């Protein structure tokens, strides 16, 4: 659920939504539009969103996509937390392409709502040649994402924010607190880019 954002400083882009070293992202660093997704690998609506988001990524090579691992089901289903940590470690160790392959492979298992296994995670990690022995610590990154989600008023997944990479304001940012279609996401990208055509 989205409780709203305080726009008083007019600096949504400076809120931690823009890409930074610790957060997985895919797409050009100088993109004019950024799409940020908060997700949990065990969330069924995140799983339904995954193929829609994959379509949008392929259709928008000029947009930056930022992935905020937000394992809200981690206490109920430990694999949520394990998958999130592994994803962040792959990002830091192997980069954007390996991360996106891992991310999509986890969703491709079709295992959510408590069905994701350690074997699923290991297989997806092995496929991108992840070396667990040299994996960096990512707890600080997860804590930062959790704090940001709380600041934004997100308590569930998925949650998406589509914003221009510079000059974000209440007028050109779209917040989607829940599942959405590729078409609706594309409209939000066009809106953030300043394309007013309907």
Language model segments and positions:
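Residue-level detector of conserved, well-ordered beta-strand and adjacent loop positions
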Residues: 27, 36, 177
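Envelope-exposed proteins and targeting segments
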Residues: 31-34, 61, 156-158
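Structural alpha/beta surface segment adjacent to cysteine/selenocysteine redox centers
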Residues: 36-42, 47-126, 152, 193
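A short beta-strand-turn-helix
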Residues: 16-33, 57-58
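N-terminal targeting signals for export/organelle localization
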Residues: 1-15, 198
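C-terminal cap of thioredoxin/glutaredoxin-like
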Residues: 1, 122-198
């Amino acid at each position: 659920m989205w409780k709203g954002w305080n726009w008083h400083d007019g600096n949504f882009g400076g809120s931690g939504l823009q890409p930074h070293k610790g957060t997985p992202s895919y797409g050009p660093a100088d993109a004019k539009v950024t799409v940020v997704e908060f997700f949990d690998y065990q969330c069924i609506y995140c799983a339904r969103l995954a193929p829609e988001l994959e379509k949008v990524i392929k259709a928008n090579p000029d947009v930056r996509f930022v992935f905020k691992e937000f394992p809200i089901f981690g206490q109920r289903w430990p694999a949520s937390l394990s998958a999130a940590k592994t994803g962040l470690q792959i990002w830091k160790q192997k980069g954007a392409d390996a991360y996106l392959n891992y991310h999509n492979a986890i969703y491709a298992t079709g295992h959510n709502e408590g069905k994701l296994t350690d074997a699923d995670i290991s297989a997806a990690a092995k496929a991108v040649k992840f070396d667990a022995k040299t994996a960096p610590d990512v707890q600080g990154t997860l804590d930062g994402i959790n704090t940001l989600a709380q600041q934004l008023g997100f308590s569930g997944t998925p949650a998406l924010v589509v914003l221009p990479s510079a000059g974000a304001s209440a007028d050109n940012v779209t917040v989607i607190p829940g599942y959405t279609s590729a078409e609706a996401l594309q409209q939000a990208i066009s809106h953030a880019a300043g394309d007013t055509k309907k």
